[in-house]
């Protein structure tokens, strides 16, 4: 330290910091009179040196509002008119007028209404109803949403509360918001194309939360299952005839009018985009707003970005202007079950391919699918620059403008590229990527650490000719490796799995296989394997192969399902035993116990006395075994009896829920149900198995019909079932998991007979969390 010390920076607002320096260095310390802006002043000096005599291209924060009409050139106005034309096409034919002699259908301007409003308007007006669409999201919408919303959903879903409340205040007779279960993408080849878990549930959940029925309003929420064709959608819409009191033939005619309106709108927007692309010059730079339909035109969800870009003289189009639906990317993304994801990545390919196009990619805070898609989007864009901004309710206008200015400035230095004479925007590169369903022999196969299940799963794979090993248990260092590759609010299992693979690769670069199962949708966890593959490819880990069987179809695809189920049951039976008895029980078994050994152990455990409170634990498999920060083991050590939802039962439920994929195995599934029932009877008071597993479907169907994602139907039903015979229920899920939020929105707390406590896991369990849990258990 020298003799003259000057403290700078906003930290000097803290007098304790200043006093600490002065106590150490005395009068040598002075506080700069401009300490709070010294960094900005230094950055300005550096910028001045870099610019030299050149003129700045910065147009100022207030420029869009300053003499806007006078300063716009004809070209800018033309671009603005072009962009706004899509919104005009969406609302074509809508008046918003209310005839007091007619009943009124209110429509929240949210989610898929941004695609289906032409159909909605044509359908209901043809039937003689008034149609009232809520205004575009405003500060008042946000205020109402913040006042009435339950839980931390993604921002687009949270805004629905505000839109519905506005319709309640307008005293409409009906509120129309469809439930999107599946939505077919034209070129998709996946088994099912799911809407996200919120699209599958939001309409009913929010209507119930706002209690619209008590206010004399009826919810119209037909379930759209586009995977089953237009007939399925027609059937869903025609099903409204009974509620509306209108004969089906009249509804059918109105539906035809609505369907034609949607097709006209889609074709008109794509025609617009094709015409614009045909007029581009080599030095033109067109910005493509990449997000879902509702994120494009909603003035809050798009954060005013289209206007900011247009005001700066750029042409702006949206994903809908590009022929994204014409691309088949199935060979590269064979299990991308989100239709929006397919469209977004198709758009990314088109943008990366066209030299004049640049992406502005908007993601949503709290959106599970976006946490995975953003990795794949980055891979598609390669070296081409793009701007990605996460949308949430706390965004800063100044921050958005600053990022836009920096991005546009970088584009100024991109050289102009003339299109080849034979250029075809749809001729993009496809890089086939097929993840193996079964392991290769003679190559080490690493299994995720899953507590008591891992040794028996390893024995199962060894019987099938594999060379199995267990991945390391989660540590802070391993999690840091995984999180170094994350960019958003990825669920905890993703960085944990990725980090464990990267940790293993640091020690050994020889060929290896890693087991990361997939699902058919619709939670983010089904995409872990494909995104981890993308990360490994970027890191040139070509010797690391993934084995990613589809969980829903294991009964049809797996070798020796009987042995696989015994491996799962072995872990379930060990967890049913008191913790201090588990080692002795497993020591009596073969590497993979047979049926007689399992039943003998179950009877021995059933003969033991139970002690302590009975606490149910229901959640995702990794959270119940490896990612709970030792909470369940600690409770057992304190004398509590923890009844963990059996993994065998959870997968059996998933397989039965997807019986169309497993019909040849229906008889085997019935046999396994009988085995679980027998084992449950033998375990007695130690059993976490349902006495009659079929009752789980009755509970699930009443609360979450037409739902796919995170095995949420089982988790809901199991929590309710266990609550009738336990003192408390703990639900364990990764923080930010959308399915966990859905279960809460569907009233799981109220449905359970015992008190319920949610463990939202992100590897940060601490004394404060323990205090909350202990306070909860004290009253159970």
Where are these regions (language model features)?
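An N-terminal assembly and electron-transfer interface module characteristic of large anaerobic redox
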Residues: 1, 15, 23, 27-28, ...
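FAD-binding beta-loop-beta segment adjacent to the flavin cofactor pocket
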Residues: 18
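Glycine-rich beta-strand-to-loop/alpha-helix junction loops that act as flexible
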Residues: 2-13
């Amino acid at each position: 330290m020298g003799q003259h010390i000057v403290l700078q920076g906003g930290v000097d607002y803290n007098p304790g910091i200043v006093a600490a320096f002065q106590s150490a260095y005395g009068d040598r310390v002075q506080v700069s009179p401009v300490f709070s802006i010294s960094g900005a002043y230094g950055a300005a000096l550096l910028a001045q040196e870099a610019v030299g005599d050149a003129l700045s291209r910065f147009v100022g924060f207030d420029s869009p509002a300053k003499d806007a009409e006078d300063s716009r050139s004809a070209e800018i106005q033309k671009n603005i008119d072009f962009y706004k034309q899509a919104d005009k096409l969406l609302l074509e034919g809508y008046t918003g007028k209310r005839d007091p002699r007619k009943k009124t259908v209110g429509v929240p301007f949210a989610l898929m209404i941004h695609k289906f409003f032409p159909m909605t308007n044509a359908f209901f007006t043809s039937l003689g109803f008034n149609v009232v669409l809520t205004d575009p999201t405003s500060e008042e919408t946000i205020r109402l949403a913040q006042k009435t919303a339950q839980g931390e959903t993604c921002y687009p879903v949270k805004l629905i509360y505000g839109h519905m409340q506005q319709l309640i205040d307008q005293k409409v007779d009906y509120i129309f918001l469809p439930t999107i279960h599946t939505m077919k993408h034209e070129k998709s080849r996946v088994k099912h194309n799911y809407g996200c878990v919120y699209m599958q549930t939001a309409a009913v959940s929010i209507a119930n939360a706002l209690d619209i029925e008590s206010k004399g309003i009826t919810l119209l929420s037909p379930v759209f299952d586009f995977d089953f064709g237009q007939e399925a959608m027609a059937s869903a819409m025609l099903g409204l005839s009974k509620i509306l009191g209108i004969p089906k033939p009249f509804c059918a005619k109105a539906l035809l009018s609505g369907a034609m309106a949607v097709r006209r709108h889609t074709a008109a927007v794509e025609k617009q985009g094709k015409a614009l692309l045909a007029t581009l010059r080599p030095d033109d730079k067109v910005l493509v707003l990449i997000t879902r339909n509702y994120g494009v035109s909603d003035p809050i969800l798009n954060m005013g970005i289209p206007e900011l870009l247009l005001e700066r003289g750029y042409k702006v189009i949206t994903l809908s202007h590009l022929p994204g639906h014409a691309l088949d990317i199935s060979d590269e993304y064979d299990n991308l079950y989100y239709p929006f994801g397919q469209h977004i990545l198709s758009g990314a390919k088109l943008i990366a391919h066209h030299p004049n196009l640049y992406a502005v990619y908007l993601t949503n805070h709290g959106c599970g699918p976006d946490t995975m898609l953003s990795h794949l989007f980055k891979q598609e864009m390669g070296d081409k620059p793009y701007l990605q901004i996460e949308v949430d309710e706390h965004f800063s206008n100044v921050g958005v403008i600053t990022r836009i200015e920096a991005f546009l400035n970088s584009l100024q230095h991109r050289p102009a590229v003339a299109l080849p004479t034979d250029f075809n925007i749809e001729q993009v590169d496809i890089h086939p990527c097929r993840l193996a369903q079964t392991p290769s022999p003679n190559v080490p196969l690493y299994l995720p650490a899953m507590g008591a299940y891992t040794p028996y799963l390893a024995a199962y794979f060894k019987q099938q000719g594999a060379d199995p090993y267990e991945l390391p248990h989660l540590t802070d260092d391993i999690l840091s490796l995984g999180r170094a590759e994350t960019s958003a609010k990825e669920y905890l299992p993703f960085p944990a799995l990725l980090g464990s693979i990267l940790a293993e690769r640091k020690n050994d670069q020889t060929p290896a296989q890693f087991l990361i199962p997939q699902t058919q949708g619709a939670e983010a966890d089904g995409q872990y394997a494909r995104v981890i593959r993308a990360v490994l490819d970027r890191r040139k880990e070509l010797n690391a192969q993934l084995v990613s069987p589809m969980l829903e179809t294991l009964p049809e695809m797996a070798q020796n399902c009987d042995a696989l189920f015994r491996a799962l049951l072995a872990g379930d039976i060990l967890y049913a035993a008191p913790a201090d008895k588990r080692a002795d029980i497993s020591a009596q078994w073969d590497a993979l116990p047979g049926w007689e050994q399992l039943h003998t152990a179950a009877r021995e455990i059933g003969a033991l006395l139970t002690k302590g409170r009975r606490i149910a634990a229901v959640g995702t498999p990794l959270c119940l075994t490896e990612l709970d920060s030792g909470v369940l083991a600690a409770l057992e050590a304190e004398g509590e009896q923890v009844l963990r939802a059996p993994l065998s039962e959870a997968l059996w439920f998933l397989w039965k829920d997807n019986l169309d994929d497993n019909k040849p195995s229906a008889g085997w599934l019935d046999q396994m149900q009988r085995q679980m029932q027998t084992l449950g009877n033998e375990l007695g008071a130690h059993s976490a198995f349902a006495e009659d597993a079929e009752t789980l479907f009755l509970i699930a169907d009443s609360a979450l019909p037409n739902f796919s994602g995170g095995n949420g139907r089982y988790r809901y039903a199991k929590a309710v079932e266990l609550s009738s015979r336990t003192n408390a229920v703990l639900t364990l899920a990764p923080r930010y998991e959308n399915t966990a939020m859905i279960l809460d929105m569907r009233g799981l707390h109220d449905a359970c007979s015992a008190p319920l406590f949610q463990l939202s896991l992100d590897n940060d369990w601490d004394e404060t969390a323990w205090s909350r849990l202990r306070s909860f258990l004290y009253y159970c």
